[in-house]
Swiss-Prot record:
NAD(+) binds at G7, F8, K9, G10, R11, M12, G96, T97, T98, A122, P123, N124, F125. One of its GO terms (cellular component) is cytosol. It is found in: Cytoplasm. Belongs to the DapB family. This is 4-hydroxy-tetrahydrodipicolinate reductase. Pathway: Amino-acid biosynthesis; L-lysine biosynthesis via DAP pathway; (S)-tetrahydrodipicolinate from L-aspartate: step 4/4. CDD domains: DHDPR_N (cd02274). The gene is dapB. It is an enzyme of class 1 (oxidoreductase). Keywords: Amino-acid biosynthesis, Cytoplasm, Diaminopimelate biosynthesis, Lysine biosynthesis, NAD, NADP, Oxidoreductase.
Amino acid sequence: MRVAVSGFKGRMGHEVVKTVLREADLELVAVLDHEPKEKNINEIVEFSSLDVPVFGNLSEMLEEIKPDCVVDFTTPKVGYSNTKTILEHGVRAVVGTTGFTPEQISELRSIAESKKIGALIAPNFAVGAVLMMQFAQKAAKYFPNVEIIELHHDNKLDAPSGTAVKTAEMMAETREFVKQGAADEVELIEGARGAEYEGMRIHSVRLPGLVAHQEVIFGAEGQGLTIRHDSYDRISFMSGVALSVRKTKELETLIYGLENILD
């Protein structure tokens, strides 16, 4: 498959480029960056042996290169518009950018189905993180008292993380509604109890040195259960990205969540 990478200078995008180069059935045909200084990726020392054009305009790249799939790891500010543009050009998309609303996902799914092309948006591409979410969903049926703590590097722009939101959404499907905490609790400092989703509390930590980590903490009379996943390196996401790129060939709709394509 001919693959283009949007946001290739970001930490995730850079790792995606290396992954595409490693995979025998994937070919890197273009990269995209906001206002790039380079015209070819070989102007970067690490990729000096390659011949891959660098673009600053997404539509121009799509029309000139006509890739089979675009992998987008950019920012929440442009993730939606990028994905919409990719799909409207009839090109498959794998998107790790977070911050999409349910309405935006629904609209993008309609575009993918009208074009009969596959696309996948996932808040997390680490298989271990997907398993964490599935385990938490099952546990929430029996432990409705639960809070989420997600921890990421301090350059992450959105909070809570897409993984935390997706986890809460999945738990809400099996969990009896409980508003977590005392009914008359008072926040002495606003926000001390974190964000709230369907009665569950979500806490976001941003610190240098972290990559991506999440704990789902359940409490009950006389017992507790903690489910935790840690990504220590961005390589942990790459098998999921490669799998998703290949899977788009089989789809004619947009899938939200890596768990929906795992066997």
